[in-house]
């Protein structure tokens, strides 16, 4: 399973972002998926 835009993700142990998104932790302490365009 994957999570979409603005959904919480984890770099190390999931959940991971869907294709087209990557996990960023710049919104610390929460990591979220953002579009990789």
UniProtKB/Swiss-Prot annotation:
Expressed by the venom gland. Disulfide bonds join 2-18, 9-23, 17-33, 25-31. GO terms for cellular component: extracellular region; host cell presynaptic membrane. InterPro entries: Beta/delta-agatoxin_fam. The keyword Disulfide bond applies. Coiled coil: none annotated. The keyword Disulfide bond applies. Insecticidal neurotoxin that induces an irreversible spastic paralysis when injected into insects. Modifies presynaptic voltage-gated sodium channels (Nav), causing them to open at the normal resting potential of the nerve. This leads to spontaneous release of neurotransmitter and repetitive action potentials in motor neurons. Its main location: secreted. Keywords: Amidation, Disulfide bond, Ion channel impairing toxin, Knottin, Neurotoxin, Presynaptic neurotoxin, Secreted, Toxin, Voltage-gated sodium channel impairing toxin. It is found in: Secreted. The presence of a 'disulfide through disulfide knot' structurally defines this protein as a knottin. This is Mu-agatoxin-Aa1f. The modification Asparagine amide is found at residue 37. One of its GO terms (molecular function) is toxin activity. Belongs to the neurotoxin 07 (Beta/delta-agtx) family. 03 (aga-4) subfamily. Aga sub-subfamily.
